[in-house]
């Protein structure tokens, strides 16, 4: 019966209200209610779009023309998709128009990195259906990537490209992990819109399918998508899985990295997969990086991203990663990019006066006189006064033999001084010193008092003279 016994200590531990955290209580998951959609009338949307005028025309979507609309007395900017009602063929209830399909999906799913549905309008008299969605003022990702206009240089930043890729990956992952799975089937740069805050939003759900793979509706829906982004293993309705979206996203990722279109007849090979994957396999990651990117990332960052893109476009669907793995990879890459940039800025600031002036270096010969007393020893052919010299000790890249060279820095002259190979031989030695003439902002360092070395006679500090040489 010892299992049922309890003592005072255990009783106090159980009843200790001081250490009890109310946040640890198991919370009942809240039900996610579908977003409330507004039902507009046709006349209201006609006024908001100036009669669907050409001045309000934004573009053409997968199932209609898109217009800019000003609603609620100018308080709400929206985009209106106008499409014609089509009659279904036969009595097959599974045949749903793209606009009805988009209304069904967007009425169930809502995400901050998606172009969400505000409302809709059905006008049977005019045989027209209209979708009212969020307005994206900065166009498509395709326009920003491939526009030749000098004004469209907004994606010259590597960090911004990675941010857009991560936002779309999160949106696709949210679709795949929704309460009822959604497969987009048409992920491409034209369906990625940029909002007013510079964020990427996934749009156009006309071809998307909602439901389990075993649903009858999905089994009889023929393959669809855009050439260049379409999964090559998706040949029949039964082949559809979430990995088809992964393939399309891999094409989009290669497009973001390289700046090339999915299909470009101006290049050979014209398909971005046939061009990029062999380069990635050879390890030539810089060759696929867009030249328009100003702050090009380091090798390790490009490699990680390029390998993930190559995995996404594998011909076998089962070998592709899921979107959760893609999201985690992009998060890591986005964290690495600022870290590398910060290290690069520090490295550039540190080596600004040492490495950036290598083209303006000069070699002079310094004659060192060893004869006589220490007072008579002197260094000739050096114009810098000892009183004006300040030192900075900068270790170079570690060598395999534990021997290091040191760079002596001054406000006016920098000299690279290494071990003297002729030390101890003869009374006079000619030592070659490489002087680096500074032209940039000097490095701020603490001043140190210098003295002459007993063995060579070159100006050195106590810190340098006392350092062990291996």
UniProtKB/Swiss-Prot annotation:
Residues at the active site: 186 (proton acceptor)
InterPro entries named in the record: Kinase-like_dom_sf, Prot_kinase_dom, Protein_kinase_ATP_BS, Ser/Thr_kinase_AS
The protein's name: Serine/threonine-protein kinase-like protein At1g28390
Annotated keywords: ATP-binding, Kinase, Nucleotide-binding, Phosphoprotein, Receptor, Serine/threonine-protein kinase, Transferase
EC code(s) of this entry: 2.7.11.1
Family: Belongs to the protein kinase superfamily. Ser/Thr protein kinase family.
Species classification: Eukaryota, Viridiplantae, Streptophyta, Embryophyta, Tracheophyta
Residues annotated with Phosphotyrosine modification: 234
Source species: Arabidopsis thaliana (Mouse-ear cress)
Modified residues (Phosphothreonine): 221, 226
Binding site for ATP: 58-66, 81
SMART domains, per the entry: S_TKc
Residue ranges occupied by any Protein kinase domain in the UniProt entry: 52-333
MF terms in GO: ATP binding; protein serine kinase activity; protein serine/threonine kinase activity
Catalytic function, reaction form: L-seryl-[protein] + ATP = O-phospho-L-seryl-[protein] + ADP + H(+); L-threonyl-[protein] + ATP = O-phospho-L-threonyl-[protein] + ADP + H(+)
Pfam families: Pkinase
């Amino acid at each position: 019966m010892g299992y049922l016994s309890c003592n005072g200590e255990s009783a106090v531990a159980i009843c200790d209200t001081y250490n009890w955290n109310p946040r640890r209580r198991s919370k009942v998951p809240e039900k996610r209610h579908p977003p409330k959609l507004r039902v507009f009338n046709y006349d209201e949307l006609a006024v908001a779009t100036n009669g669907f005028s050409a001045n309000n025309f934004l573009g053409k979507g997968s199932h209609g023309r898109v217009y800019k609309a000003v609603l609620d007395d100018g308080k709400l900017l929206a985009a209106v998709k106008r499409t014609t009602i089509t009659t279904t063929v036969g009595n097959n209830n599974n045949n749903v128009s793209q606009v009805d399909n988009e209304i069904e999906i967007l009425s169930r799913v809502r995400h901050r990195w998606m172009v969400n549905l505000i409302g809709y309008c059905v006008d049977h008299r005019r045989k027209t259906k209209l979708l009212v969605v969020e307005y994206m003022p900065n166009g498509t990702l395709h326009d920003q990537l491939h526009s030749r206009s000098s004004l469209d240089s907004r994606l010259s930043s590597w960090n911004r490209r990675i941010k857009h890729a991560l936002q779309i990956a999160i949106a696709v992952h949210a679709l795949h992990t929704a309460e009822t799975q959604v497969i987009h089937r048409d992920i491409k740069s034209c369906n990625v819109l940029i909002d007013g805050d510079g964020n990427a939003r996934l749009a156009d759900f006309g071809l998307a399918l909602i439901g389990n793979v075993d649903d009858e509706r999905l089994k009889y829906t023929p393959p669809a998508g855009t050439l260049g982004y379409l999964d090559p293993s998706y040949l029949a309705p039964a082949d559809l899985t979430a990995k088809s979206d992964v393939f399309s996203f891999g094409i989009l990722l290669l497009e973001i990295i390289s700046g090339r279109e999915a299909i470009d007849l101006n290049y050979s090979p014209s398909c971005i997969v046939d061009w990029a994957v062999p380069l990635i396999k050879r390890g030539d990651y810089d060759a696929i990086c867009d030249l328009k990117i100003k702050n090009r990332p380091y090798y390790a960052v490009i490699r990680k991203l390029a390998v993930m893109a190559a995995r996404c476009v594998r011909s076998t669907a089962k070998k592709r990663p899921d979107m959760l793995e893609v999201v985690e990879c992009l998060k890591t890459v986005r964290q690495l990019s600022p870290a590398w940039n910060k290290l690069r800025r520090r490295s550039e600031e540190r080596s600004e006066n040492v490495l950036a002036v290598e083209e303006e270096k000069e070699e002079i010969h310094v004659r060192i006189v060893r004869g006589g007393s220490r007072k008579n020893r002197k260094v000739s052919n050096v114009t810098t006064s000892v009183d004006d010299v300040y030192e900075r000790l900068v270790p170079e890249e570690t060598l395999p033999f534990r021997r290091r060279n040191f760079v002596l820095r001054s406000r006016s002259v920098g000299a690279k001084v290494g071990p003297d190979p002729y030390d101890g031989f003869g009374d006079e030695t000619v030592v070659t010193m490489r002087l680096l003439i500074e032209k940039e902002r000097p490095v701020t360092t603490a001043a140190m008092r210098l003295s002459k070395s007993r063995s060579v006679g070159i100006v050195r500090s106590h810190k340098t003279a006392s350092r062990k040489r291996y």
